[in-house]
Amino acid sequence: MTQLAIGKPAPLGAHYDGQGVNFTLFSAHAERVELCVFDANGQEHRYDLPGHSGDIWHGYLPDARPGLRYGYRVHGPWQPAEGHRFNPAKLLIDPCARQIDGEFKDNPLLHAGHNEPDYRDNAAIAPKCVVVVDHYDWEDDAPPRTPWGSTIIYEAHVKGLTYLHPEIPVEIRGTYKALGHPVMINYLKQLGITALELLPVAQFASEPRLQRMGLSNYWGYNPVAMFALHPAYACSPETALDEFRDAIKALHKAGIEVILDIVLNHSAELDLDGPLFSLRGIDNRSYYWIREDGDYHNWTGCGNTLNLSHPAVVDYASACLRYWVETCHVDGFRFDLAAVMGRTPEFRQDAPLFTAIQNCPVLSQVKLIAEPWDIAPGGYQVGNFPPLFAEWNDHFRDAARRFWLHYDLPLGAFAGRFAASSDVFKRNGRLPSAAINLVTAHDGFTLRDCVCFNHKHNEANGEENRDGTNNNYSNNHGKEGLGGSLDLVERRRDSIHALLTTLLLSQGTPMLLAGDEHGHSQHGNNNAYCQDNQLTWLDWSQASSGLTAFTAALIHLRKRIPALVENRWWEEGDGNVRWLNRYAQPLSTDEWQNGPKQLQILLSDRFLIAINATLEVTEIVLPAGEWHAIPPFAGEDNPVITAVWQGPAHGLCVFQR
């Protein structure tokens, strides 16, 4: 039998050099590591990794070729109280594997044991890693590098975005290929999108609990192989990587960036009762934050938390991010529960992973977006990330909903959020673009559901409606659910228009949830993470609706307003913004705090947003000049207005002079 040569300790993973494959694996506490390779008949062949350089185990298998299936058995102590859970009866996934063969099904054999080890061998049913070789012609691909001030983000799910699209070939709907189809690209261009932000595409697993209920993890925030593409989104698992890169190349040619939602905060191994796939059996003590009793710190709500202050885990995370940039040409990342990235265990701006990203010539040049919280004490860190990061601005989301959906909110608070939440983000040299403004996201109500439901309706998730937030700041306008009288439909439409206008014409970086521009509803489900069905798949029959045109017109209007695209903080007297009351006078201190919800926002001295968020028709005296409404607010008869605009109840209009 072929023997392993010692090989090299870097890079991590399995790498083919034309003559054989070099295998490397980190484990600081292992006593022995076996490489297990499987032939075409499924027969297992085991080799001890002969090289041991520091905490890196390595070996070189001559004559091995791409397509070889492999895994690891890692020997070491079973000492749960100390955080060690080695079990060589279990075949483990290489954390740096580029492709996985097999499914992560709920099976007792895929568990290591809780207090006592389960020594039943699982190689027959465990997923295997696959050695891949990387040859791809990027042609003249170049990143668009859209300036932050001009960036419009569109958050979408790979499958849900195109699975029901009637103009995309049936055989590629819901796949990576569909993202690069001309129909999809033309739609994004016409809408005005500059960056497509994809929910997780790294391989993930469905939680055993969901599988037992006949459900699946749809969103993908349960990662199992961070270097491997999720194969279900590919036309063929063997060509997934090229399909994905083809889509990115096509999007880049159209000037559209691709941002990946990435999950570095936890793994699909969940809590101690969860499955054993990889990290827990390779070096549980190093990869995870471990409590004094040997259990996990659950700062993510998912059962475990990756220890991103450990040097080896920092190297692993950094290598993963570089892989997606260098191999797939992605343009940035949105980091799920990103406060975990800064835990040491307390949150620090100079945490090891932040420092590694800052010092990396590759990662420091791409767009970085944080979901700036986790669920642990001290986990809410909005505004506290290092200067390279932009952050989801939940202050904006809540203020916009409260202002327009009949909750109390002073004008001053609304204006502060409209002005990129400078009280939160104007520090450490950060620019207004650091505020990622959103009204909705994958997590929560869709925009249509915000105006149709007062309460969540998550019964389909199998948790008796306990899951999902109860703090929605929504308003059903008098009737719970979709449909209703013409008057009800019109009032809901007006609220949607107001929320979209606030999102797309405010300072900061706007993020639009895919489907909001044509009224997608999840029927009140505000936590549809396990709904891989028509509840979450976008219905494109409404894509030519007036709402889509309204949204596109707003985006194109935004691009014409210097105060919004120059990405500079607004200062008193700089001509970027003036805040006026209904009489076109500067607001008094009392009006800012106690005045009616009536406001005029003059941008770049030429564009005026006139707002009447009260329940009464109100005369709004415009500033001096000849004003006319501009699309999408201009009607067929669009007379010049020189004095007064009749502001409808709960309405707004944008003018230009």
Curated annotation (Swiss-Prot):
<dbReference type="Pfam" id="PF18390">
    <property type="entry name" value="GlgX_C"/>
</dbReference>
<feature type="region of interest" description="Disordered">
    <location>
        <begin position="458"/>
        <end position="479"/>
    </location>
</feature>
<dbReference type="InterPro" id="IPR022844">
    <property type="entry name" value="Glycogen_debranch_bac"/>
</dbReference>
<dbReference type="InterPro" id="IPR044505">
    <property type="entry name" value="GlgX_Isoamylase_N_E_set"/>
</dbReference>
<comment type="pathway">
    <text>Glycan degradation; glycogen degradation.</text>
</comment>
<keyword id="KW-0119">Carbohydrate metabolism</keyword>
<dbReference type="InterPro" id="IPR013780">
    <property type="entry name" value="Glyco_hydro_b"/>
</dbReference>
<dbReference type="InterPro" id="IPR004193">
    <property type="entry name" value="Glyco_hydro_13_N"/>
</dbReference>
<dbReference type="GO" id="GO:0006974">
    <property type="term" value="P:DNA damage response"/>
</dbReference>
<keyword id="KW-0378">Hydrolase</keyword>
<feature type="active site" description="Nucleophile">
    <location>
        <position position="336"/>
    </location>
</feature>
<feature type="site" description="Transition state stabilizer">
    <location>
        <position position="443"/>
    </location>
</feature>
<dbReference type="InterPro" id="IPR017853">
    <property type="entry name" value="Glycoside_hydrolase_SF"/>
</dbReference>
<dbReference type="InterPro" id="IPR006047">
    <property type="entry name" value="Glyco_hydro_13_cat_dom"/>
</dbReference>
<comment type="similarity">
    <text>Belongs to the glycosyl hydrolase 13 family.</text>
</comment>
<protein>
    <recommendedName>
        <fullName>Glycogen debranching enzyme</fullName>
        <ecNumber>3.2.1.196</ecNumber>
    </recommendedName>
</protein>
<comment type="subunit">
    <text>Monomer.</text>
</comment>
<dbReference type="InterPro" id="IPR011837">
    <property type="entry name" value="Glycogen_debranch_GlgX"/>
</dbReference>
<keyword id="KW-0326">Glycosidase</keyword>
<dbReference type="GO" id="GO:0005980">
    <property type="term" value="P:glycogen catabolic process"/>
</dbReference>
<feature type="compositionally biased region" description="Basic and acidic residues">
    <location>
        <begin position="458"/>
        <end position="467"/>
    </location>
</feature>
<dbReference type="Pfam" id="PF00128">
    <property type="entry name" value="Alpha-amylase"/>
</dbReference>
<dbReference type="InterPro" id="IPR014756">
    <property type="entry name" value="Ig_E-set"/>
</dbReference>
<dbReference type="InterPro" id="IPR013783">
    <property type="entry name" value="Ig-like_fold"/>
</dbReference>
<dbReference type="Pfam" id="PF02922">
    <property type="entry name" value="CBM_48"/>
</dbReference>
<dbReference type="InterPro" id="IPR040784">
    <property type="entry name" value="GlgX_C"/>
</dbReference>
<dbReference type="GO" id="GO:0004135">
    <property type="term" value="F:amylo-alpha-1,6-glucosidase activity"/>
</dbReference>
<feature type="active site" description="Proton donor">
    <location>
        <position position="371"/>
    </location>
</feature>
<dbReference type="GO" id="GO:0004133">
    <property type="term" value="F:glycogen debranching enzyme activity"/>
</dbReference>
<keyword id="KW-0321">Glycogen metabolism</keyword>
<comment type="function">
    <text>Removes maltotriose and maltotetraose chains that are attached by 1,6-alpha-linkage to the limit dextrin main chain, generating a debranched limit dextrin. Shows only very little activity with native glycogen.</text>
</comment>
